[in-house]
Amino acid sequence: MAAVMSVNESTFDAEILKADRPVLVDFWAPWCGPCRLVSPVIESVGEKHGGRITVAKVNTDENQALAMRYSIFSIPTLIVFEHGREAARLVGYMPQEAMEERLAPFLA
């Protein structure tokens, strides 16, 4: 399985909300500079912690209904879903160490 999966409006509920472990979802867009900066960090988290957390990406340009559903007003926005509910929200770029620190409760 890839370190990071892409989801869309038709696969989101099954892949994210019904997942049996925490899921980190990166809401991004191709034109977004900070999104491009955080992308390698997201990939690394997926590779390093893939056994404990699922990592997914949602292109907000292609999935505007999902962006509206989760009130995504700026990108990148990262949401951790646990048991089908939003458990944490991170907005903007952050280095890997800071991201892993914020995700620590979900990686145990």
Where are the regions that the model predicts?
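Conserved Rossmann-like nucleotide-binding pocket used by diverse enzymes
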Residues: 3, 8, 28, 54-56
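A short beta-strand-turn-helix
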Residues: 5-23, 64
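Conserved hydrophobic/aromatic "anchor" residues
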Residues: 12, 27-28, 70, 81
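Non-catalytic, surface beta->alpha helical segment in thiol-disulfide oxidoreductase systems
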Residues: 74, 79-108
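Short pre-active-site segment immediately N-terminal to redox-active cysteine/selenocysteine motifs
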Residues: 20-21, 28-31, 74
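Conserved helix-turn-beta segment immediately C-terminal to the redox Cys motif
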Residues: 20-22, 37-58
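Conserved redox-active cysteine motifs that mediate thiol-disulfide chemistry
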Residues: 27-41
